[in-house]
Amino acid sequence: MQYPTVAQVVLDGPDARKLAEFYRQLFGLRYRDGDEPPPDGEPDPRGADWLVLRNPGGVQLAFQQVDQLPEATWPEGEHPQMLHLDTTVPSVAALNKQHERVLALGGRLLHDRSDDPEEPLRVYRDPAGHPFCVFVHEVDPETDRS
């Protein structure tokens, strides 16, 4: 049997370029050809519509411009999240390093469980209000499929 393949995860936001830049810098991704930011002062028609970040060997991220997007009120509230990204790092030291990067890039800390001995993690909100997680997960490439 053949199954569909996930091609990309699409995140809506009121500023697609700003959101794409946040994730490009956070994950070290590159733009799809033609989606790169224009020179300063030039119009950015693609940035006001749809952008794609390539992730060699993984699922790509796309960003769609919307007029309004209420922030998700995680973990409960009027605007529950519909999707979030789970990302991993190999150690608590790496978790702490990424914490500084996320904040410097404009992310906001929502929940800090970095001292949890079983699964250290932090939950953040990206510049458009989407929650995402960074947690410690030591991967054994021979056995791990998560």
List each model region and its residues.
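Short, flexible helix/strand-to-coil boundary loops that buttress conserved ligand/catalytic motifs
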Residues: 23, 67, 99
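Core segments of cupin and vicinal oxygen chelate
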Residues: 1-4, 10-61, 104, 112-115, ...
